[in-house]
């Protein structure tokens, strides 16, 4: 599947809209690169945790951590016992719990160390990363590969951008991985809704009613 995004002439030269279109196109094209079997195993493990009333603990560093927080929030709306590792109010990880580790590189030391500890106490570790052969990917029970910018793709992008007259990447650093993971996890939430028979009204009732 290869799609093109057409911008109105008035927006072609605007950096905000050009960047938005680049990110959207990357996310759409990444769909074919994400393995269905990996996704089904990940969703199935989440369903097991829900039905067995176990805990889901999500972790990530930096912007990946923010993506993880958004995912944990939606899991809470579905009725999961979900937490974000690193927050002040987090219960201990037990056997049968699921730890979801988000790291584009799969090498972030604090994430790898926490995943190793989770494995030692008997938890299942699911990694979302661009590099399945990374330290995080190798130690995880479940790996979902989500595309992101790599060293080789940077070189390919460089020559393509030279031809187009674009000399700087429009989506810097880990932006493409983080945004793609965010959309992917929203898809996971909808899959869980259908599997568990949960509708939007239920989620609305689970939403916080005392907010700052």
Swiss-Prot record:
<dbReference type="GO" id="GO:0097367">
    <property type="term" value="F:carbohydrate derivative binding"/>
</dbReference>
<feature type="domain" description="SIS">
    <location>
        <begin position="46"/>
        <end position="198"/>
    </location>
</feature>
<dbReference type="InterPro" id="IPR017552">
    <property type="entry name" value="PHI/rmpB"/>
</dbReference>
<comment type="similarity">
    <text>Belongs to the SIS family. PHI subfamily.</text>
</comment>
<dbReference type="InterPro" id="IPR001347">
    <property type="entry name" value="SIS_dom"/>
</dbReference>
<dbReference type="InterPro" id="IPR046348">
    <property type="entry name" value="SIS_dom_sf"/>
</dbReference>
<dbReference type="GO" id="GO:0016853">
    <property type="term" value="F:isomerase activity"/>
</dbReference>
<protein>
    <recommendedName>
        <fullName>Uncharacterized protein APE_1940.1</fullName>
    </recommendedName>
</protein>
<dbReference type="Pfam" id="PF01380">
    <property type="entry name" value="SIS"/>
</dbReference>
<dbReference type="GO" id="GO:1901135">
    <property type="term" value="P:carbohydrate derivative metabolic process"/>
</dbReference>
